[in-house]
Amino acid sequence: MIRIINLRVAVTVKSDIKSIVEKKYPPLRGAIETIHVVRRAVDARKKPNIVFVYTLFIEVHNEAQVMKKLGKEKDVSVFAAEDPEPIVLGAKPLAHRPVVMGFGPAGMLAAFYLAREGYRPIVLERGQDVDTRSHDVETFWKKGIFKPESNVQFGEGGAGTFSDGKLTTRITHPRLHEISKYFVEFGAPEEILYKHKPHVGTDKLRTMVKAMRERIIEWGGEVRFGSKVTDLFIENDRIVGVEVNGSERIDTTVVLSGVGHSARDTYEMLYKRNVEMTAKPFAIGVRIEHDQAVIDESQYGVEPSSLGLGAAEYSLVYHDKESGRTAYSFCMCPGGQVVASASEEGGVVVNGMSLYARDSGVANSAIVVNVGPDDFGTHPLDGVAFQREWERKAYELGGSNFHAPAQTVGQFLGLSQAPSVQNSIYSYEPGVVNCDLHDCLPSFVTSVLERALPYWGRRIRGFDDPAVCMTGVETRTSAPLRMGRNEERISPTVGGFYPMGEGAGYAGGIMSAALDGAETAILCMAKYAKPN
């Protein structure tokens, strides 16, 4: 196989990729069997001359002869694709079916691989199926009626179901492409296999997770909604069963825990049951919203649809010399909306979401500042208490009815005659209240944001416009703790318990969580034979 990198093609060029390759590299004419687009990125650094930058895998006739004719082309090489390691099944007897806690990306992929290999997992998800859950979430947004077990955080697909559906990850692993191909099989757009910053969108994600659940069941797995694991049964420091909804017992010696970073009551239960965990850093801040046209103009210099481009994205970082902290944009959602994401009564949490089309006309992103155990304490659950404190203050500022506190950039920076939120763009439902965001965030966070906003305004024109709306608070950027696990991914303190995914502190997004779930299941299967 031949690999071509850095193939630069103007976005205005309409020729097919095969013709472009053959024109640039004449020895390939007539020799190409297949072309696979591995990656396509947008380079808009020299506006208005915007280009796609491709990486390609190409299968050809007479590869050695073609490479000889190509000579020393620096961007062309012979490439041997690395396949995922084959799955090897273990021999240790498994008297009961394995249990998977949670049906987000980690739990879903763990269950998928277990079911594919005949292990018939039992999935216990505290929330509801995606259709019921979507109705409950819409009711919460429109009417403020909150359901603590069916919301943006809990239910089929996990928190990622109500997000932009980003599939980006910094991890390189041969199984990632395999997982992406499964996602396409179940309804994700084929472009996720090659786009530099792939996304699915919350609308397509809902279809995809349902199809994956149906396949797990078809292969002998069981998926139970409204089923919260409320306790672990442990004998001689090993799992022997789980309690469901405070009453039912399911015997098992293997539990793969894919609970999310918002399952705080589950964290507390696991801590009481001696599952090893430590506090870890995360970040908190607010959501900021702009007219998408402002971001498009800054990033592309033109209206993106005229060039066949999607709504523009951004990624911003500010290193604060005064405090030593870092502020950064997080989970940027082009053409999306800010959503109410509470998972508990008495707290306001915001997040961002986009449909696949990203066509709302409004860009939003979290802008957050790093915090750590030095700020909130070293007890494993201190980060949870810290999050709750600021979520509660935001809830009270908003009127104790899940309306969110919001403030314009001008007000936040203390500018005279700054416009109010009522005259700005905001999308949070059930509503916002113009408040001082300094009252629902620690001063060491707000002071960094005050310095970061003008800095970012010099990089994206209009970013710090006084009329831009910010909504609080964003606290669930990542898990506030990490559960211990050994080289087999088993808890060192509770045998048979496998922490995995974002809630356990081992992932930071859909793809990394999915991969962690898959690889954890594969290691589990390498130890155990199929259950009777």
Model-predicted regions and their roles:
Residues 1-52, 56-162, 166-532:
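Residues forming the flavin
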